[in-house]
A protein has these predicted regions:
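N-terminal active-site segment of His-dependent metallophosphoesterases
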Residues: 5-53, 60-85, 100-152, 179-307
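Extended active-site neighborhood of metal-dependent phosphoesterases/phosphodiesterases
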Residues: 226-229, 307-458, 541, 554
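Beta-strand-turn-beta hairpins that frame and shape the catalytic cleft
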Residues: 230-243, 249, 415-434, 468-471, ...
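Active-site neighborhood of phospho(di)ester-bond hydrolases with catalytic His/Asp-centered motifs
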Residues: 243-245, 288-295, 320-327, 435, ...
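Active-site environment of divalent metal-dependent phosphoester hydrolases
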Residues: 250-253, 298-300, 327-335, 440-443, ...
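Conserved beta-sheet core of the metallophosphoesterase superfamily
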Residues: 313, 484-564
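Active-site-proximal segments of metal-dependent phosphoesterases and phosphodiesterases across multiple
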Residues: 439-452, 458, 465-515
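A short C-terminal boundary segment appended to hydrolase-like catalytic domains
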Residues: 560-592
Length: 592
């Protein structure tokens, strides 16, 4: 083909940089998002995610008062024995019927905490931390950085606690606690009273949570430090693990990635090369596991997951691969429109999780088990759980028709399956615990924030507590500590944070000597230690790491030793570069 030489269609154009702050212009990205933002859907989402749970939380005091008055009313003027029996019946009904109501109220309360309070706390904390780090007298050592950040957390927590108390006191002094009889008032009056009560409850809970975080910082011992390798030859590894992360697989041969745009690689050539390198390394010295810590795909589309599965179709090491989901796998609403808002009940959220669950099933469903929430013991295999009678049919209906029943079932399944556990076999020195650290997001600006749910933390504690003295590799997407360097941007600290990271650390650190945490997300090449817990942060296998290696993909081969009682340690890891000058498919073809 010949024609006027204008540009090469294979090498992208301006449209490939629409969602990239690096390949395009950040100001243009913000303006585009604001113009394409659906304010009607956002308003509906605000009512659903914030206002409705707040009403549910705030109406509890009024319902309690109304029910108490009802019980007292039926008892007055009656025979004492009849009154006692009536009160007993009403109390029994309150316990029987009120339990689901209380459960729903608590669910709404915690939803507000994770949707509103925790992100506000993280933002306040990181703003204060960044101010502290920018003060004269530059923080040079790891200890100084940790001390400055701890001070920033304490100040931020105290400020937020003061704000929460001030908000609650202001509402109480201005309006009083709204205890009304819900039988005799109009719905608007009840709603207004519930919202005012919710503000008081949230203000006080914010103060309590903030003071708790302050206390935890004051009580904490040990800083985040860079890891020091063992002297060469001191120990012999008994396990070799390939740690890849953030593959960002695209669904098009010449497709670019959202974050990098045309500055990054196109197509899936780098992923294919990384897998070939892993295979060559295994042929030289056998690998025990191949771990991928999230962002397997670039936007969680069906085509991207299909590409991933095609890459592994005949891959000899497929049965050694384990992965966890990242925010790009489950939280990208629209890869071409950063202003699009996703309603809580939309099919999109459920479908992205269904695709991820399907890939988990196909790759590791015959060895990963879910945790029984009641006993804390290991339950059925993932493949058996997903295939239980009726469940597979509902999920198939979701995939084919986007049914409401299928959406509800998928959300229940997602809450149920994590953490996944690949228990150590008798001959294995360690097992895997796979966490989902992605907060449920409805908009591009919040898609990268992380949360490990309370139910997951409870199950994680149970597995670590009930397991024999074996070592565990704990996989998640988000970082559990901030890196001990002062140059991290405020947007990264807030927008990429695991908002309840202290809770995750608290669950793991009692077993720190036999745990190794592996994660990705931040595209940073770092290995460290926090309170005796080993932490491995992986660069992106396609987009590299921050600094000189940006867009130069790489991964690690970790050499692990396991001692008595499951104590785990690392030997100097091997860093493998994926980047090559011609890493895109089609470079050998003449330009169009």
């Amino acid at each position: 083909m010949t024609g006027t030489r204008i540009f090469d269609l294979r090498r992208g154009d301006y449209d490939d940089n629409r969602t990239s702050p690096h390949g395009g212009n950040i100001r243009s990205l913000i303006v585009t998002a604001a113009l394409e933002f659906n304010y009607l859907k956002a308003s509906i989402g605000f009512v659903t995610l914030i206002v409705a749970p707040a009403i549910f939380v705030g109406i509890v005091p009024s319902l309690v008062v109304t029910y108490s008055r009802l019980k007292l009313g039926v008892a007055v003027g009656r025979n004492p024995m009849v009154a006692v029996l009536t009160l007993a019946v009403l109390a029994g009904l309150a316990i029987l019927l009120g339990r689901p109501f209380v459960s729903k109220a608590l669910e709404s309360f915690w939803r507000l905490q994770y949707t509103l309070v925790f992100p506000i706390f993280v933002a306040a904390r990181e703003v204060v931390r960044s101010i502290v780090e920018s003060l004269p007298g530059k923080l040079a050592t790891v200890e100084e950085i940790d001390r400055g950040r701890r001070f920033g957390t304490i100040i931020g927590g105290l400020l937020l606690a003061g704000g929460g108390i001030g908000l609650a006191v202001t509402v109480v002094l201005s309006y009083g606690l709204q205890l009304i009889n819900v039988e005799r008032v109009q719905p608007w009056v009840v709603t207004r009273a519930a919202l005012l009560n919710a503000v008081v409850i949230l203000g006080l809970s914010t103060a309590v949570e903030s003071l708790y975080w302050v206390w935890r910082e004051l009580a904490a011992r040990g800083s985040v430090e860079d890891w020091a390798p063992l002297p060469s030859g001191q120990e012999t590894p008994i396990a070799r693990v390939a740690h890849l992360s953030d593959l960002h697989i695209v669904g098009e041969r010449y497709g670019y990635r959202m974050e990098a745009g045309t500055r990054g690689p196109r197509g899936n050539g780098p992923v294919r090369k990384a897998l070939q390198q892993v295979l060559a390394i295994d042929e030289s010295t056998a690998l025990d596991r191949i771990i991928v810590t999230g962002d397997v795909t670039d936007a969680g589309t069906r085509a991207e997951w299909a590409e991933f599965l095609d890459l592994l179709q005949d891959y000899p090491l497929r049965d050694r691969i384990s992965f966890v989901p990242g925010n790009h796998d489950v939280n990208i609403v629209d890869r071409n429109n950063p202003g699009r808002f996703d309603l809580p009940w939309s099919a999109g959220q459920a479908l992205r999780r269904l695709r991820t669950a399907r890939a988990l099933d196909l790759i590791q469903g015959d060895r990963a088990r879910i945790v029984d929430r009641d006993s804390g013991n290991l339950g059925p295999l993932l493949k058996d759980y997903l295939g239980e009678s009726g469940r597979a049919d509902l999920l198939r209906e979701l995939a084919e028709d986007g049914t409401n029943a299928g959406r509800r079932e998928m959300m229940k399944v997602w809450e149920r399956i994590f953490p996944l556990v690949e228990a150590p076999k008798r001959s294995d020195p360690y097992g895997l615990i796979l966490l989902d650290s992605n907060a449920r997001s409805h908009f591009a600006l919040t898609n990268a924030i992380g949360v490990v749910s309370p139910s997951q933390l409870k199950a994680l504690k149970a597995v670590l507590r009930n397991s024999p003295p074996r070592a565990w590799l704990i996989l998640l997407h988000h970082a559990v500590v901030e890196y001990p360097v002062p140059s991290i941007s405020l947007t990264d600290r807030i927008g990429l944070a695991l908002v309840n990271a202290p809770d995750v650390l608290k669950a793991i650190t009692p077993h720190a000597s036999r745990c190794l945490v592996l994660h990705g997300h931040r595209h940073r090449d770092w290995i460290g230690v926090s309170r005796g817990l080993l932490l491995c942060s992986a660069p992106s296998a396609t987009l590299g790491s921050h600094g000189a290696d940006q867009y130069r993909g790489s991964f690690y081969i970790h050499k692990i030793t396991v001692g008595a009682g499951g104590s785990i340690s690392l030997i100097t890891p091997e860093r493998v570069s994926v980047f090559e000058a011609a890493d895109s498919i089609g470079d050998e073809v003449p330009p169009l």
